[in-house]
Amino acid sequence: MTLTEQFFSQLPEDNLAALRRTDALWRSLRLGILPVPTVVRESAEPLEKIDWDVVICGGTLGILLGAALAQRGWRVVVLERGSLRGRDQEWNISRRELDVFVSLGLLTSAELEQAIATEYNPARIRFFGGDEVWVKDVLNIGVDPVYLLETLKQKFLQAGGQLFEQTPFAGAIVHSNGAIVQAGEQRFSTRLVLDAMGHFSPIVQQARQGKTPDAVCLVVGSCATGFPPNETGDLLVSFTPIQNQCQYFWEAFPARDGRTTYLFTYVDTHRDRPSLEALFEDYLRLMPDYQGVEFNQIQPKRALFGFFPCYRNSPLKPNWDRILPIGDSSGSQSPLSFGGFGAMVRHLQRLTIGIDQALQADVCDRRALSQLQPYQPNLSVTWLFQRTMSVRMDQKIAPNQINNTLSSVFQGMATLGDPVLKPFLQDVVQFPALFKTLTKTALTRPQVVVSVIPQVGIPALASWMRHYVTLATYAALYPLSQPLIAPWLTTLSPTARYYSQRWLDAFKYGSGGDYGE
């Protein structure tokens, strides 16, 4: 019996089956045999009657936006294929990012505090052979998904929203003035469809037409007891060189019922990449070295596993009128992050206001909706970082090159202070911080820059330069655009106001200007 089988034998039987189902999906992706569904069709006929303003497909994170829109008076339906209930595993985020729930009126301050299950400080960053860097107040809050989603669900229902559970999305027909959503045995007519079904949404699969992801983040982990007492966390740690053409990274933090640990790695979709079960075996094999605990002392509460595909063509632009991808469906997170809750929260206020204005102006065509998922150069520049943290199957680099590069970069950021380090750790890249980091690394560790160029390749570097220059442009335009455009917004027509506000949002979020607000 493998370590993985021994570990999963202590959990309900369906856990190992779920791991192997996810592995089968990962294998199909590597082999390029995932079927491309056809779930969206178009009709030139207008709808005679429209019952809803918004239908949200996918309730786990869709309920966040659903509650915000329902409280603004819109007729909103949320469709969930199962039961709308949060998972038992906490969502980790920084406290500042949670303020949006209070500012949007979704939670009171007391409710927000009750939603916080755990809090720890500080967190460690360290790479094999390098020095430790410690930070405070970054991804150190564990939110209770069960309480949060139940509270938001009740707020949603109290505001007049309707929730349909056990109602899986089956298809949509886009008409000139709305859309029909088929879910379960029911049909819903609506002005706008929001796709919150995640990375493997059938709508997204149809839109991408089987395109292979440009990168994938593989993640395995668990919440367990039996570890030595430790009230600190790890944000990004490695303690091994490259193995199996993968650089393994680790994350750990205290949880309500134990300690959560993850192993993750950045890869491409080469058919010889490891399975999640093989990665889980390495996770358990290396755990004694990582946490100072013998395998037989670990008492698992939950197993965690998954993979997150990333596309350079992100955020995903709408392919049809009346349908907008949001959250993981849109790919609106950097290729370095797991996306999910944190990415949804970051864009919650922007999407709430933007969708509200789109409905007011009745601009739900493809061109208008694409303004809600704009190009973000601060996300695009992170693709180069993703390449420096991964190695191709046919590539030969020094075993510790990735560790040495990252150690040099993060040591440099640490000396530049929290204003440089913290935003990057929270998936927000800003031009001044990036410029300072790259300049310091080039001046103090030129050998690191020289070693990275052949690793990432000239084409990737050239593409990155374009995004880097655009990021600098956005950083300059954002503070200029606010005083020039914002005072005139109230004098514009609803349509002109919608497009103007989207430009302001693009500069703000694309430059990382939303950080700290």
Residue ranges and their predicted role:
Residues 55, 59, 65-90:
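Glycine-rich FAD pyrophosphate-binding loop
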Residues 158-289, 348:
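Predominantly flavin-linked oxidoreductase catalytic cores and closely associated redox partners
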Residues 2, 20-32, 353-517:
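C-terminal helical "tail/cap" subdomain of flavin- and related membrane-associated enzymes
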Residues 83-124:
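N-terminal FAD cofactor-binding segment of flavoenzymes
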Residues 95-104, 122, 130-148:
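Dinucleotide-binding Rossmann-like beta1-alpha1 core, especially the glycine-rich loop
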